[in-house]
Structures are given as C-alpha cells and as structure tokens.
Amino acid sequence: MPPSDPIIVLGAGVIGLTTAVRLLEAHLGANVHILADHWPSDALDAQYASTIAGAHHLSFADDGDARQRRWDMRTFDVLYDEWKAVGERTGLMALTQTEMWEGATSHLAVYEGNPDFRVLDPRTAPCSNITHMVSFTSLTIAPTVYLAALEARVRDLGAKLHRAHVPSLGALRTDPALLALYTRPPAAVFVCAGLGARHLVPAPEAAALFPTRGQVVVVRAPWMRAGFTRQVGSLGGGEGGTRTYIIPRCNGEVVLGGTMEQGDWTPYPRDETVTDILTRALQICPDIAPPYARSWPKDDQVAALRSIVVRDAVGFRPSRAGGARVALASAAGMRVVYNYGHGGAGWQSCWGCAEDAVALWAGGAGGARL
C-alpha cells in the first residue's frame, strides 16, 4: 500500500488510541486519520466507557485463556515501564492490590506474574467470609489524564483527528463529507469503536454486541493509596459474580464500585445503587471512611462517605458474546482490522491487543479469532 493511502482508525477510546500509537510507531509517516464520535475531553457519556472505567490493571483472564493472559501481561509490562520512566505524570499510580474471594480457595494464575505477589491469610481480611486472599503490585490509571497523553502522542506522530460519525464502513469510501477529511478513499480501516461497532458489522455479528452496565461512585479520599477487590461467585472466565472494588488514583480520587448488568442501557445512576456501593466499599476497606467518622455507627459512616462523593457515573462496557474480536478481514473494498468487544478488560489489555491488531494489518503473526 503506498504511504499516501489513508488508514482510518475508528474510535478514540483507549483501544483506538493505543492502536493508533502502535500503528504510527511501526509505520512512520503513515497517513493515519482517527475518526470518532467521542473524545477524551468530552463530558462523561455512558457510551464512551474509557473515561468512566475504574481503570486499574486487574486481569480477569482465565487460566486457560492464553490470548487474554498474553494481552493483559503485555499491557501491564508497558504500563509499568511507563510508570517507572515518568512516574504519575501520565496518570499512572503503582500500589499494593489486595484481592479477596468469598467461597473460592484459589486465584487466577495471571496474578502470580505481578511484582510482590503474596498469598495472605484470609483470616486477616477486613471483612467476614473471606476464603482466599492475595496481594501484589499493580497499577491504576486516571483515564482522562492518560487518554489526553495518548491523544498528544498520536498528534505528535502525525495522525489527523476528526470528530465524525461513521454510519457504515461503506460510507468511508462513498460519503462526500467523510471523504473530504482524508481526500481519497481509504485502503484500510481499524474498527476500535466499542459498542459503536454494532453499526459497522453485519447483522449476525452486531447481535453479539451488548452493553454491560457499570455504575461507580467517585469519592475524594487522597489518604487511600492501596486497592482492594472482593469477588463473590465465579468470574466464569470473564466478569461473572459480584465484585466490590476500591480503586485509588494519583489525583486523590477513588473509584468505588460496582455493578455488572448485561443488556441494561440505562445511562443514569440509580440512587439505591449508590448506597449499596458505599456500604460494600466500607465492608472491604473501613479506611475508605473519612478519618473523623471511622468510629461512628455503620449507617453514619455511609453518610460520611456520601459527603465526599465527587460524582457517580454509569458506563456501558462494550461486551461481545464469545469475547473480544481481534481479526483481519475485507469489507467495503478495504482491509479491515477489527479490535473491539473487550467488555471491562479494555484498560488492562489495550497495549497487547493493539500490537496484535497492527501485526495483523502488517501481515505478521497475530491472534486472529473471527
């Protein structure tokens, strides 16, 4: 393909921007255009999950899922190296992560690859009924900071950025308004559009895409510098069961969650869910309460925690039956690389799947699964 042929990346979430970075790094001077409805500096929108996500590196990869484990481990390595190089400047924060389970007596093997991995005595857990507990060093990400840094990187690498709605892949080659952005029909496109991919794929594939609604509460608690998660029930190779999580960020905000509601398109927070999340967060980490309230009765602690709420928000995880799709195909007269359907795993797998997507486009080895 001549360098002057446009290459389109659809989507400007963490999947689209990391894919664009790797594409531009591997092919300097490529004529890359990123088209998206939503951008990192926009107001929060449930359809743009990247800025609402908890955004910590915590793999859900089943022991038998080599592809997901590889993506997640590669992404951790990239993020950890970045944190060691620039610290918290791009929104990364290293911390001790404690994982607790009710009912289970083992952990995902992928955690053993993290620094400082330890199996802990569950009897020392801050809440009752814990049957297994581990800790390790991990990372959290302040999404708007990290996404802004990615946007700056793709600009510096020469990408052109456009706010544009793309109704179909064919429109990229036929719609005059779109063609005016990049002057000639594109020869290749990367579909990194999350749930927006429903409009860019045939009907049978579109039917496999669905939202998994997640509601979170963000509090201002700069004293928190450690992460905690409690899992009740099986992950089921993904995000099954009920999870309660506490995710501190380098800016002093802490994300409390959460919910996993498949097929629920409700974009606004439910107040009863806010109360439930605050109550569960106090169960797994009493120190999330403001210091002055820690000796108070539990209901009063919930009220105190509510007083430091910065916002509550809802995001739609871009889920896909059968898992993420990272594959090369042809459509509308173009080579198409699909990189979507990552559900709640986009942040922890972004660099790994971006590298696979670019390798597929370049004709190298990749993990295509149609």
From Swiss-Prot:
Its main location: other. Optimum pH is 7.5. Changing H56 to A/N: Alters substrate specificity; capable of oxidizing D-methionine, D-phenylalanine and D-leucine. Markedly inhibited by anthranilate. FAD binds at I15, A49, S50, G54, V166, R317, G346, Q348. A motif (Microbody targeting signal) lies at residues 368-370. GO terms for biological process: cellular detoxification; D-amino acid catabolic process; nitrogen utilization. Changing H56 to D/F/K: Loss of activity. Keywords: FAD, Flavoprotein, Oxidoreductase, Peroxisome. InterPro entries: DAO, FAD-dep_OxRdtase. GO terms for cellular component: peroxisomal matrix; peroxisome. Selectively catalyzes the oxidative deamination of acidic amino acids. Protects the organism from the toxicity of D-amino acids. Enables the organism to utilize D-amino acids as a source of nutrients. Enables the organism to utilize D-aspartate as a source of nitrogen and carbon. This is D-aspartate oxidase. The gene is DDO.
